[in-house]
Amino acid sequence: KVDHIAFTGGPETARHIVRNSAENLASTSLELGGKSPFIVFEDADIDSAVNAQVSGIFAATGQSCVAGSRLIISNKIKDAFLSKLAAKAAAVVIGAPDDIATEVGPLCTPAQRDTAVKLIAQSVAVGAVVVSGGAPLKRDGNFFPPTILDCSDAPDAPCLTHEFFGPVLSVLGFDSEEDALSLANDTAFGLASGVFTRDLSRAHRVIRKLRAGIVWVNTYRAVSPMAPFGGHGLSGHGREGGLQAALDYTKVKAVWLRTSDDPIPDPFVMR
């Protein structure tokens, strides 16, 4: 008998697992995908935010559930930010995983590469602009360059909603804090998020309103076994790490222990 199932993967497989777990009502912990927003306000440290964004989306070739795949940036600094980001993306060393100089390796499968090509083409067709990358490299293997798509004029572009599991960043600009939150929460996923600002009060307001299991402020991808890791919506439920993970693997038991030696009175005797 299986009492609990912990799964890391995609929503479709998770649905299959949940349906089958109903046979014996086993509990589940599901760590699924994400389409994580990376919000940069106009007062942010741009150089730090650029470096964090490069790591957030291009590390591990973007094959990460917490990849910061949606850059939501103040229109006041958007052009300057994208200029720096595109330069960093173009300078990334792409190569074989066993080469110590490699910074971005290949995608795991040809299917991932083909999906990226398809989604980028569909996004460009509705108005997205390729800022950097955009097409697989002409070499053996599933190599795909760091890609940046400006979707400011393409709010319905599929690259904004589909998880690539690859090094593809979609960009949207905003004019107000409310706009930023609306764009950030416009997703069926709810795993991770990043917020870059020097305004601590703003950071706390945004933290409260973001629908995400993880919020990183002025950093990205910080992890610890002491911190709960997980999300909600299409990102699943349950947690890895922290006290919450331990609770997911335990059963609650209420115990009442009477210590008095006095006899229990007859409840039906009139007093």
Annotate each PLM feature:
Residues 39, 136, 143-271:
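Conserved C-terminal structural/oligomerization subdomain of aldehyde/semialdehyde dehydrogenase
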Residues 6-7, 195:
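Conserved SAM-binding loop
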Residues 4, 10-154, 217, 264-266, ...:
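ALDH superfamily catalytic-core signature
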